[in-house]
């Protein structure tokens, strides 16, 4: 009611092309007195109380509306995508698919330009209902990504059973990618498995040039993280994308010294 919630967005790039191909929407709470509340604090409370359902509906429409505006203004590619995180409470809401449909209609965005991001934990809680909802979303063209992949307990069985289209490699693996052989082997295995299943892969939390070079060597073509861009406000996205699009192929034009 006080309009203290807002969205920021982090660009996702194609490492080989150097293009911004999509964005992830992230929620922020800035109070009237100027202080900020961490999502790690308010999201669990919103989930527990159920208020995450209306908040999530607002965020979904807001994110898609931002994307439609950027496309119309020529800020990003016409096929750029928006990734929106969805909580267990939202996914188990019987009206969720209708909410997604309405947001797509009101924003005039095609379904295949929306990524719904869920964690493996979402599929542990009431798996049959989660499976039904994700299948219905997939049927209308919305794509599903597993966020923080590799940190859960039943990843492989979920990949076989659920309609998953993308794996987002958790930042804990990326942190040690350039310096730890075991981390590199794990990331290589995840990428190879995803490729064999026809799944898209995005590396999260890329913060150093060395990590980006390592991802390029492992043929992971999509990435996001502070090296590329911090989450930015909708108003500053035009200058952010313009700056990123001028860089070109990231590993080649940011050589290691």
Q: What is each PLM-predicted segment?
A:
Residues 19-22, 101-177, 191-231:
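The catalytic core of metal-dependent phosphodiesterases that act on cyclic dinucleotides
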Residues 186:
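Conserved N-terminal phosphate-binding loop of PLP-dependent enzymes in the Aspartate aminotransferase
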Residues 46, 50, 124-125, 176-182:
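Short, contiguous acidic/charged loop-to-helix segments that flank catalytic cores in large enzymes
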Residues 1-109, 121-122, 135-136, 156, ...:
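Bacterial c-di-GMP phosphodiesterase EAL domain
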Residues 216, 232-257:
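C-terminal helical cap(s) of enzyme catalytic domains, especially alpha/beta-barrels
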Residues 39, 93-98, 127-131, 156, ...:
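Conserved strand-to-helix beginnings and helix N-cap segments that scaffold or border functional pockets
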Residues 44, 93, 161, 179, ...:
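Phosphate-coordinating loops and pocket residues in cytosolic domains that bind phosphorylated ligands
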